[in-house]
Each structure stands twice: as structure tokens, then as C-alpha cells.
């Protein structure tokens, strides 16, 4: 779990080019004086991870406690929270271990440290993949609930949801091991990027279609009650704003990391790309920020879940 300059080892394999030249530590004339490197203090990294950890633990606890929340939709939300929890927890663990090793407070053999680092990398990578998958699964679940409302409970059953969850977890672990083992192959990095773009397109298409259906429904109600057109327009603008925020946060938090992977393949030695590579820790911090925001978007908006969460917090006191 060594640190290269200011670069954390976490997913360090994804922060190296297929060649032996490292991205960090380049000469000043290679990146230029204009190159901006955003430093993420370890304290901030740990704080973000802790906030995400607490939030997602609360979501998992609330869903596990309330049997009314044991439905396919909340099953996906719970697994999303668990994935985000693992993303944050593995980042916190590696940061803490790295700091202890640097301070000399933790003595370990190089082989042990390397094995620990590999395990943490697999957990981090698999939880990131599963998080993206569950975001897509939630979008599909909501789409079916709107466009196939009468058949929803026969299409999306709890056993099917559990099988889908198991398949996502198994595939995420297997593919993460494959990606980390062959990280120096351009095809592997491109597969990760294509996977991210596929999830982005899937979510965008489904949510835009759902927004269009909601606007049509609102327009029909407005005509039925002979309301004025501005009311329908206001609903459409509100829905569009919500959709923009949802997809915007997803792209803002995940996009830079996958841009990083794309540039590793396209321009590993270019000065501009080398400058972007310096901000790898910032891209990881944005993913942790997404793990903080996910519960606010998908979980805490549920009145039933908030009520259960309140009971859990009161009982803990």
C-alpha cells in the first residue's frame, strides 16, 4: 500500500498507464505551469467516508428493521446503500492503513501489505461496479412500475429481485478481479468505460421516458379539470429540473473517474492528460460524495423509511 508522491495506492493499478511511466512525478515542463492539481487532505477523505458510512448504515438498518420495506424496490435501494457503504469503508480503511504505515505505527511485511491492498482493491472495484448496477436496477424497477403498473407485482417479484441482486454481486466480484488482474490491458479499461456509458444511457432513456409519461398524465388531468396550461408547464419544468439534477449528479460524480480511465488508453503520455491524472484522488472523492448523495435521492425521500429511521435513532438513545 505504498504512496507515490501524493497519490494514494487505492486502485493504483487504474492510475498507471500500460507502460512503465508513472503519471505522477512528471517534470514541470511536461505538464506545464498551468497544470492544476487539487489536493485532497487525508482528513477530508476520511470525513467524507465516515459521513457516507453512517448514512448508508442507517439506510440498511432501517430497511432491515421494517418488514413493510421488504419489497423489490427497497431491496435494490438497500443493496445500493450496501455498495456505497463498501466503497466508503474500503477507502477509509486503505487511507487509515496508509497513514499508519507512513507514521510507523503499523509494522507489516511487504507481502502482507500487498495482499491486503489487493483485497481492498477488489472490494472497492466490485462495490463500485455493483453500485452502478443497482442504480440501473432502480431505474428499471421504477420504469416497470410506471409503464406496467397493473402487472408490476407479477413481473418484479421478491424472488426475482433477490436473484438479480445475487447475479449483480457475483458478476461485480468476478469482473473486478478480472479488471484488477489485467488492468494494464487497454481493452479492460475500455470495457469499464463502456459499462459506465451504458448505465448512463440506460438511466437517461428510462428517466426521460418516465418524465414524458408523467407530463402526459399531468396534461390529461389538467384537461379533465380544465386547468390553465401554465400549471402543466410548471409540472414539466419541475420534472425536468429533478431529472437534470439526478442525471447531473450521477455524471458529475462518476464521469471524471471514467474520463481518467479513457485518457489512460487514449493519451497516456500527453502533458494535458498527465495533468488530469494528477487529480485521481479528487475523482475518488467525487465517487464518495455520490455515496453520500445516493441515500438523499433514493432512500430518505421515503416517508416510511424516515419514520423507521427515526424509531431506530430514538431506540439507540
Swiss-Prot record:
The UniProt record lists lipidation (S-palmitoyl cysteine) at 315
Write out the transmembrane intervals. 38-63, 73-93, 119-140, 164-183, 192-211, 241-266, 280-300
Localization, per the record, is: Cell membrane
Query: What's an example of a GO molecular-function annotation for this chain?
Result: melanocyte-stimulating hormone receptor activity
Provide the family line. Belongs to the G-protein coupled receptor 1 family.
Organism expressing this protein natively: Allenopithecus nigroviridis
Q: Which residues lie on this side of the membrane: Extracellular?
A: 1-37, 94-118, 184-191, 267-279
> Glycosylated at which positions?
29
Underlying gene: MC1R
Cross-referenced Pfam families, in alphabetical order? 7tm_1 (PF00001)
Lineage, opening ranks: Eukaryota, Metazoa, Chordata, Craniata, Vertebrata
Keyword Cell membrane included in the entry's annotation: yes
SUPFAM superfamilies per the UniProt record, alphabetical: Family A G protein-coupled receptor-like
Going by the UniProt record, its keywords in alphabetical order are: Cell membrane, G-protein coupled receptor, Glycoprotein, Lipoprotein, Membrane, Palmitate, Receptor, Transducer, Transmembrane, Transmembrane helix
**A single GO CC term, please?**
plasma membrane
One GO BP annotation of this record = adenylate cyclase-activating G protein-coupled receptor signaling pathway
Q: What is this protein called?
A: Melanocyte-stimulating hormone receptor
Amino acid at each position: 500500500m505504498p504512496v507515490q508522491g501524493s497519490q494514494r495506492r487505492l486502485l493504483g493499478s487504474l492510475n498507471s498507464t500500460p507502460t512503465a511511466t508513472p503519471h505522477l512525478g512528471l517534470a514541470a515542463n511536461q505538464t506545464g505551469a498551468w497544470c492544476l492539481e487539487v489536493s485532497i487532505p487525508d482528513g477530508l477523505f476520511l470525513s467524507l467516508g465516515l459521513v457516507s458510512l453512517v448514512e448508508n448504515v442507517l439506510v440498511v438498518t432501517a430497511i432491515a428493521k421494517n418488514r413493510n420495506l421488504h419489497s423489490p424496490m427497497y431491496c435494490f435501494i438497500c443493496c445500493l446503500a450496501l455498495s456505497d457503504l463498501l466503497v466508503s469503508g474500503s477507502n477509509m480503511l486503505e487511507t487509515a492503513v496508509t497513514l499508519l504505515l507512513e507514521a510507523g505505527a503499523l509494522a507489516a511485511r511487504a507481502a502482507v501489505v500487498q495482499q491486503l491492498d489487493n483485497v481492498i482493491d477488489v472490494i472497492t472495484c466490485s462495490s463500485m461496479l455493483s453500485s452502478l448496477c443497482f442504480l440501473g436496477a432502480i431505474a428499471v424497477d421504477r420504469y416497470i412500475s410506471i409503464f406496467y403498473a397493473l402487472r408490476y407485482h407479477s413481473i418484479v417479484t421478491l424472488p426475482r429481485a433477490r436473484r438479480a441482486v445475487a447475479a449483480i454481486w457475483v458478476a461485480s466480484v468476478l469482473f473486478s478481479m478480472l479488471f484488477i488482474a489485467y488492468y494494464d490491458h487497454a481493452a479492460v479499461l475500455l470495457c469499464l468505460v463502456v459499462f459506465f456509458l451504458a448505465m448512463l444511457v440506460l438511466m437517461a432513456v428510462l428517466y426521460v421516458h418516465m418524465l414524458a409519461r408523467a407530463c402526459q398524465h399531468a396534461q390529461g388531468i389538467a384537461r379533465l379539470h380544465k386547468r390553465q396550461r401554465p400549471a402543466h408547464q410548471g409540472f414539466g419544468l419541475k420534472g425536468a429540473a429533478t431529472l437534470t439534477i439526478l442525471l447531473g449528479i450521477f455524471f458529475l460524480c462518476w464521469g471524471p473517474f471514467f474520463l481518467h480511465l479513457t485518457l489512460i488508453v487514449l493519451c497516456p503520455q500527453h502533458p494535458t492528460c498527465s495533468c488530469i491524472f494528477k487529480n485521481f484522488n479528487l475523482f475518488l472523492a467525487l465517487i464518495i460524495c455520490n455515496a453520500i448523495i445516493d441515500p438523499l435521492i433514493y432512500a430518505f425521500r421515503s416517508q416510511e423509511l424516515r419514520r423507521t429511521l427515526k424509531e431506530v435513532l430514538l431506540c439507540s438513545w
